[in-house]
A protein has these predicted regions:
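Translation machinery proteins
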Residues: 54-81
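Glycine-centered secondary-structure boundary/capping sites
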Residues: 62, 87-88
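Short, conserved, surface-exposed binding loops centered on an aromatic residue
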Residues: 84
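Acidic, glycine-rich flexible loop/linker segments
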Residues: 47, 70, 74-80, 88-90, ...
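Terminal amphipathic helices with adjacent charged low-complexity linkers/tails
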Residues: 1-58, 158-179
Length: 179
């Protein structure tokens, strides 16, 4: 007989720990010790509804730069994203990369997506500091600012189309997935 420690997300770890305490298999202190700081941090951010995700198409995968999930409309222009966000529209800002002058749009966006960059890029660092979901380094994402659209392998997202980003996994989905 072989045994291994189960790999599970924060919610599953808490549920199994509570069950084990209720069944008197472990005490409360041991249950708390089973949770790692990273797992507790997962609980502080929005997550995609795991039951709904199978009904949506993944567009692209990039580098998970800042945790959390967000749904909104795709916007490629910084000024337009700022104005729309100020008017209560949930916006996902999409850029090849970001620079300091783009920060006003960060405040008004629910999430950021870039085709370039890494975990220490401008978009990643600023988004983490603001607690906004962010995915960077989506190298397969082709951004066409002139036609206000982006694409991956023939799948086109026009500005105004709903998308969902999961900054915890680096996945981008077509449509608005419940979080």
């Amino acid at each position: 007989l072989q045994t291994r420690n189960a790999k599970m997300n924060a919610v599953a770890m808490i549920k199994t720990s509570v069950d084990m305490v209720n069944e008197k298999l472990i005490d409360k202190n041991r249950a708390l010790a089973r949770l790692h700081a990273e797992q507790l941090e997962q609980l502080l951010h929005r997550a995609i509804d795991s039951k709904s995700i199978k009904n949506y198409t993944m567009l692209v995968k990039g580098i998970a730069a800042s945790p959390g999930a967000a749904s909104g409309i795709a916007v490629l222009d910084v000024k337009r994203a700022t104005i729309m966000g100020e008017n209560g529209v949930k916006v996902i800002l999409i850029r090849e990369e970001t620079k300091p002058e783009d920060v006003p749009a960060f405040f008004e966006s629910v999430g950021i997506l870039t085709s370039r960059g890494g975990k220490t890029s401008h978009a990643a660092v600023v988004a983490r500091g603001m607690g906004k979901p962010c995915i960077v380094g989506c190298s397969d994402l082709r951004i066409d600012y002139e036609n206000k659209q982006c694409s991956v392998d023939g799948k086109i997202v026009h500005e105004g189309d709903p998308i969902t980003i999961d900054g915890s996994t680096g996945s981008v989905y077509l449509g608005e997935i419940p979080t």
